[in-house]
Amino acid sequence: MRWVIMKKLGKIWNYLSKPEIVPRIFSVFLALVFIFGLLMPHYLNPNQLYPKPIPHSQTLKTPLAPYDRGGIPLKEPAELKAQYPQYEPNLGKITAYLTPIAEWIKDKTYYFGTTIVSTPGGILDEILYYTRGMDTVLESSILLISFIIFSWLFFNKD
């Protein structure tokens, strides 16, 4: 009985190890994850250190939208929740910085926050804020796809 199970398991592993099968299984898995993700209710989590305004509520009100956390650096602190109470006196004094070029762009347009120059990691921060760990899945997916492409190129080098 034990050998029968091991033999069947070996056949399954051998089938799954074929380079032409892996992308199919992976794409089915991704499709199921995305379908499940679309069916889940989505909402902003209010329990954040940087409270977020309702999406699009900052549009045409501040050039830093949607990245404006409030406050004026070193003058008026932003409204934040303390993760470490010992840092409460300095909390929210600096939530962002702008280079001179970024300051100039901010003064010229209301759409500065949606440009690539707005903050070095701003776009990635927003993606990570809304996805909560999806970056790990994305990075793993990119790595797996690169190995699939490499193995296909390696086995089909003729």
Swiss-Prot record:
It is found in: Cell membrane. GO terms for cellular component: plasma membrane. The keyword Transmembrane applies. The chain crosses the membrane at residues 25-45, 110-130, 136-156. Pfam families: DUF2106. InterPro entries: Prd_NiFe_hyd_3_EhaF. It is a multi-pass membrane protein. Keywords: Cell membrane, Membrane, Transmembrane, Transmembrane helix. This is Uncharacterized protein MJ0524.
